[in-house]
Amino acid sequence: MNIITLTPGQLSLSQLHDIWRHPVQICLDASAIDSINASVACVNDIVAEGRTAYGINTGFGLLAQTRIADEDLQNLQRSLVLSHAAGVGDPLDDAMVRLIMVLKINSLARGFSGIRLSVIEALIALVNAGVYPLIPAKGSVGASGDLAPLAHLSLTLLGEGKARWQGEWLPAQTALKKAGLEPVALAAKEGLALLNGTQASTAFALRGLFEAQELFASAVVCGALTTEAVLGSRRPFDARIHAARGQQGQIDAARLFRHLLTETSAIAESHHHCNKVQDPYSLRCQPQVMGACLTQLRQTKEVLLVEANAVSDNPLVFADAGEVISGGNFHAEPVAMAADNLALAIAEIGALSERRIALMMDKHMSQLPPFLVKNGGVNSGFMIAQVTAAALASENKALAHPHSVDSLPTSANQEDHVSMAPAAGRRLWEMAANTRGVIAVEWLAACQGIDLREGLTSSPLLEQARQALREQVAHYTQDRFFAPDIACATALLAQGALQRLVPDFM
C-alpha cells in the first residue's frame, strides 16, 4: 500500500491520482503541527475573551448575527453537522470518498482553520483504516463550500450515519469499533471547518481530469490507427506546420502522432504515390483539434492542482495576527469553470473520434468494404456500432452545457450566488463514459480496417495497439453479437491499454 507523507499544500497530481486509484496510508508531516496548534490557540483566545467571531460563537448563514452562549458551543458544532447532512442520491464510491477525505485533511492541516490536531488525526485514521463515510452524490451547489457532502463525511467522525468498512455498509459506530477507532467530540469552529470547503467539487473534477487524460491518449492512438486504416497521409503532422502557428497544445499533439505513426510503415508505402491531395478534416486536423483539447486539459490541471492544495474554509484564522476573517474561499467558481472547459474537451475528443468512425464506414472515403465487412448485405458489419458512437457523441453535446453560468440563491438570499461546481464535475464522469464508448468503437473499427489491408502492417506502436485488442476481440469475418466486443474494448481502455503507448503529455 502506498504511504504518503503529507506536507500540507504540496500534493502533486500523481499523488492525487494514486489516492483516487488505490487505498493509501497518510502520515502527516511534523512541520504542520505548529501552525495547526497556533490556529486552535487563536480560536480559544477569542472564546476566552468573549469576542464575537463568525462560526465560532455565532449562528450560520442568515443566522450569523445570532450570538451563541459559551455552554452551547460544542452543541452548535454537532448540530451543524447533523442538520447539514441533507444529501441525496447514490453513495459515492470508496475511491471518490477517499479523495475527498484526503483533500479535506490537506486543507485543514494548512493551519488556517482552527481545528485541533486530534480531529485531523481522526480523519487520517479513517483513511488509513479504510473506513469510508456514506456520502450521497447530490446536494451541494458549490458555495458555501460543499456543505452537504462534507457533513456526511463528518458524521462518521461523530459516530453518526453509515460508513463502509471492508466492503460492507455499517452504522458508523459499528464501523469505527471494528476498525479500532472512537468517535470525536467537536470544539468551537470545528464543525464549520469540516463542512466549509471545495473538497467534493475538486475531487469530482479531478476524477474527470484523470479520465480525460486516458481518453485523450486513447483517442490519439485510435486516430493514428484510423489514419493508417484509411490510407491517410502523415504530412499533416509535419512539425513545421504546427511551429508556424505556435499553439503549444497543437505542437505537442502533432508530436504524439509522429511518435505513434513513425516516418513510414508498410501501409504508408503502399499508397505513397496515390492521387489524393488532402485528407478529410477528421484526419488532417487532428493535431489542431486534439491540441486544443490538450490545452484545456493542461489549464484544468493547473486550476485543480491549486484548489486541491488550497485553504477553502471560512472564516480563516490568521494566528500570527490573532485575527479571524470572513471571506469567500468556499466559492468553487474556479473549479466550476475548469470543469466546464474540461467538458468541452471531453465532448470534442468523442466528436472527432465519431467522425473518423463514420469516415471508415464510407467505402468511397475509406477505400475499404462498406461498414468494414466482406459480403455486405448479408453482413451489416459496423453499421449500428457507428450509430451507437453517434448517439454517445451527441449526448455529450448536451452534457457539455456550462454549469458555472447557472446560479440559484440559497439560505434566504444570504448566499445569493453559487458555483454549481459539484454538478459541473460530476457530469464529467458520464461524459467520459460516453467518449470512452466512442473511442472503443473506433478502436474496433480501425483494427478491422487495418486487418482488411491484408499483408500490410502499421508502425510498431500501432501494431501493439492492434495486438492488444486482438488478444481479446477477434477479427470480424461475418456478423456476430457486437455489444460484448464494445464492452471488452471499453474495459481495456479504462485499464490504460492504449494510454501506456503514449508518452507523458501533461
From Swiss-Prot:
- GO cellular component annotations of the record: cytoplasm
Places the protein is found = Cytoplasm
PTM comment: the record says: Contains an active site 4-methylidene-imidazol-5-one (MIO), which is formed autocatalytically by cyclization and dehydration of residues Ala-Ser-Gly.
Q: Where is this cross-link: 5-imidazolinone (Ala-Gly)?
A: 143-145
Give the record's pathway: Amino-acid degradation; L-histidine degradation into L-glutamate; N-formimidoyl-L-glutamate from L-histidine: step 1/3
Which reaction(s) does its UniProt entry say it catalyses? L-histidine = trans-urocanate + NH4(+)
Q: What class of enzyme is it?
A: lyase
The cross-references to InterPro entries, in alphabetical order and at most eight, read: Aromatic_Lyase, Fumarase/histidase_N, HutH, L-Aspartase-like, Phe/His_NH3-lyase_AS
Family of this protein: Belongs to the PAL/histidase family.
What is the protein name stated in its UniProt record? Histidine ammonia-lyase
Record organism: Salmonella arizonae (strain ATCC BAA-731 / CDC346-86 / RSK2980)
